[in-house]
């Protein structure tokens, strides 16, 4: 199941840096984290769904790259984001 428009707007409102912000690293990572958590639950129930597993790995890689970019450019924003999302780093 894809992320609903309402849920996505809720996440965007929470992590946006300014009004109308949908593309900042924080927003992208927050949306990816929600999708990753949702796919993780799906994979736990459907262990042989290899196509979904591949999509999950692609999303994890995308999030990893965005977090590396944020860490390189603004360490304070990076730390705030991983603390608010509860990511282990």
Curated annotation (Swiss-Prot):
User: What are the alphabetically sorted keywords of the record?
Assistant: Ribonucleoprotein, Ribosomal protein, RNA-binding, rRNA-binding
Q: Which GO terms describe its biological process?
A: translation
Q: Can the keyword Ubl conjugation be found in this entry's annotation?
A: no
Which SMART domains does the record cross-reference, listed alphabetically?
Ribosomal_S15
Listed GO CC annotations: cytosolic small ribosomal subunit
InterPro entries according to UniProt: Ribosomal_uS15, Ribosomal_uS15_bac-type, uS15_NS1_RNA-bd_sf
Keyword Iron carried by entry: no
Q: Name one Pfam family in it.
A: Ribosomal_S15
GO MF, one term, reads: rRNA binding
Q: Which PROSITE patterns match?
A: RIBOSOMAL_S15
Function, as annotated, reads: One of the primary rRNA binding proteins, it binds directly to 16S rRNA where it helps nucleate assembly of the platform of the 30S subunit by binding and bridging several RNA helices of the 16S rRNA.
Protein family (similarity comment): Belongs to the universal ribosomal protein uS15 family.
On subunit structure and binding partners, the annotation says: Part of the 30S ribosomal subunit. Forms a bridge to the 50S subunit in the 70S ribosome, contacting the 23S rRNA.
User: Per its record, how is this protein called by name?
Assistant: Small ribosomal subunit protein uS15
Task: Say which species the protein is native to.
Answer: Streptococcus sanguinis (strain SK36)
Q: Which gene name belongs to this protein?
A: rpsO
């Amino acid at each position: 199941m894809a992320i609903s428009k309402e849920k996505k707007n809720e996440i965007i409102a929470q992590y946006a840096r300014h009004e109308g912000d949908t593309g900042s690293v924080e927003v992208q990572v927050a949306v990816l984290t929600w999708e990753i958590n949702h796919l993780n639950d799906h994979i736990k129930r459907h262990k042989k769904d290899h196509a979904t597993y591949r999509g999950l790995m692609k999303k994890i890689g995308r999030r990893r790259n965005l977090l590396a970019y944020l860490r390189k450019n603004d360490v304070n924003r990076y730390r705030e984001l991983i603390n608010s999302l509860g990511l282990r780093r």
